[in-house]
Amino acid sequence: MRLKILIAVMAVGLCYGAVTPLNQDKLKDYLANGAPFDFILIDVRTSQELTSAIGNAACKPYNLAWPDQFKAEALKIPKDQTVIIYCRSGGRAANAAAFLIDNGYTNVYNAGGFMTWTGSTITPSEIKPLSLLPAPSMRAAGKK
């Protein structure tokens, strides 16, 4: 029994180890100065948690609450699209990123939690509607 628990803990650790973290300062730089690639920004908090979201005039996130809504909608995104995910504190973002990686996505980043975000924000009414998914949240710098 202990061996099974140890194996399960190690498997979870390996899964999280495959998720690439994205430093929030780097995300702030992308929002302020443009990114070198198109990306989709996803907030996996529930609608009840949203008082504001990461974003600005050039970058509008999607809100796909983890797990049900995220699992139902996120697979509409092309598997080679860059996806950046965040939540309140980072845990759900890690789970959502691991889900995408497990489903063959190759450019997935965990930007951690909104609680530590000090960059630009938007109101919930400015969040990108799901009907536009998989349109990027932000286009690469110099790309229209």
Model feature map: region roles:
Residues 4-13:
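Sec-dependent N-terminal signal peptides
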Residues 15-39, 47-82, 91-144:
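Rhodanese-like catalytic fold shared by cysteine-dependent sulfurtransferases
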Residues 42:
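Active-site flanking residues adjacent to catalytic metal/cofactor-binding acidic residues
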Residues 86:
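Short, surface-exposed ligand- or partner-binding patches at beta-edge/loop junctions that are enriched
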